[in-house]
C-alpha cells in the first residue's frame, strides 16, 4: 500500500486509496463538492482554491445543482493533495508544506509552487523539485 495514496484518501475523507488505479477511479467518478471544505481545513485559502482548483462561483453553481465536480476539477483536487503530501514528507508536515508551496522559488522563475499546480506539467515540475530537495540536490 502506497503511504502517499493512503494519505490522499484520508485527506479527502475517502476510503484508503492503495493504488494509482484507485485514485484514477475516484477522479473519473468525479468528487463531490464537499471535498473543497477539506482543502480549506488543510489550510488552503479561498483565493488559492479559486486559482488552483475551482472558482467560487463555479463551486456555488455545482452545489446548487447538486452536481459533482468535473473530472478536470477532481483531478486538480488530487493534484494539490498529492503535492501537499509530497511537500509534507519533505518538510515535516502540512503546515510547513503549505508555507513552502506559497513561497516563490528561484527554480520556478520566482513563481510559487502552488501557482504551478494549475496544470499537470506544472505539478510535475513541482514534484521533481521536491524530489531534488529531498535528495539534497537543490535547496
Tell me the role of every PLM-derived stretch.
Residues 1-139:
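Non-transmembrane "mature" sequence context
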